[in-house]
Amino acid sequence: MPSSYDRVSKNYRQSELDKFAAFTSGWWDPHGPQKPLHALNPVRLDYISKRVSLSGARVLDVGCGGGLLSEALARQGAHVTAIDLAPELIKAARLHGLESGIQVDYRIQAIEDLLAEQPAPFDAIACMEMLEHVPDPAAIVDACAHLLKPGGRLFVSTINRTLAAFMLAVVGAEYVVRLLPKGTHQYKDFIRPAELAAWLRHAGLHLEDVSGMRYEPWRNRARLTARTDINYLACAISPEASHATE
């Protein structure tokens, strides 16, 4: 049966939505299928909060999943809109919000369709572990750029397309240690920092920073690193602010 969002943006793969929807029941379990994501979340939040004053800020979380980062941002005082195309995950996020008392505006919506509504621009947009799961990641970056206010920042995390990433993020994580279900990632969809930088430039954004992010399964913790050969975070700013500070 066609989904309700088949009428709107086509920049998704149904197989990807189904894959992550299967994790719904354990999304908020720190020892469940999303265990690595729980470890990454404090690092992602710290990276964002050091670059944006979150209290009172309008923040968009693109591909929010079950709401781990969305709630963390809202706890810092941000007014968070969180979008995802998996209805099961949005339902799980809303239910957890009822339990935690944290208010987030969760929507089953594609970013292209949010853009068409011409909402008030955002101070910050987070797009975490999402670009490698869509057919046209450059289009997502472009839509994000159009939704940022002058001086707003876009935060992205993804996986580099390197041999090290294939061996650790695919072979190691999915087949050896089994931290993730088999088929979670496709190597061909990984994104090199230079590719991301080109998309950001084309969208009119200025790349401020690229930092490596490393997950240590034996300690179940994550940290920033100078190495960007596997996971990495990036921050880009709208051109008005970058020009004003030159």
From Swiss-Prot:
Pathway: Cofactor biosynthesis; ubiquinone biosynthesis. It catalyses: a 3-demethylubiquinol + S-adenosyl-L-methionine = a ubiquinol + S-adenosyl-L-homocysteine + H(+); a 3-(all-trans-polyprenyl)benzene-1,2-diol + S-adenosyl-L-methionine = a 2-methoxy-6-(all-trans-polyprenyl)phenol + S-adenosyl-L-homocysteine + H(+). Its EC number is 2.1.1.222, 2.1.1.64. GO terms for biological process: methylation. The gene is ubiG. Gene3D superfamilies: Vaccinia Virus protein VP39. Coiled coil: none annotated. InterPro entries: SAM-dependent_MTases_sf, UbiG_MeTrfase. SUPFAM superfamilies: S-adenosyl-L-methionine-dependent methyltransferases. It comes from Xylella fastidiosa (strain M12). Pfam families: Methyltransf_23. This is Ubiquinone biosynthesis O-methyltransferase. Keywords: Methyltransferase, S-adenosyl-L-methionine, Transferase, Ubiquinone biosynthesis. One of its GO terms (molecular function) is 3-demethylubiquinol 3-O-methyltransferase activity. It comes from the Bacteria. S-adenosyl-L-methionine binds at residues 44, 63, 84, 128. O-methyltransferase that catalyzes the 2 O-methylation steps in the ubiquinone biosynthetic pathway. Belongs to the methyltransferase superfamily. UbiG/COQ3 family.
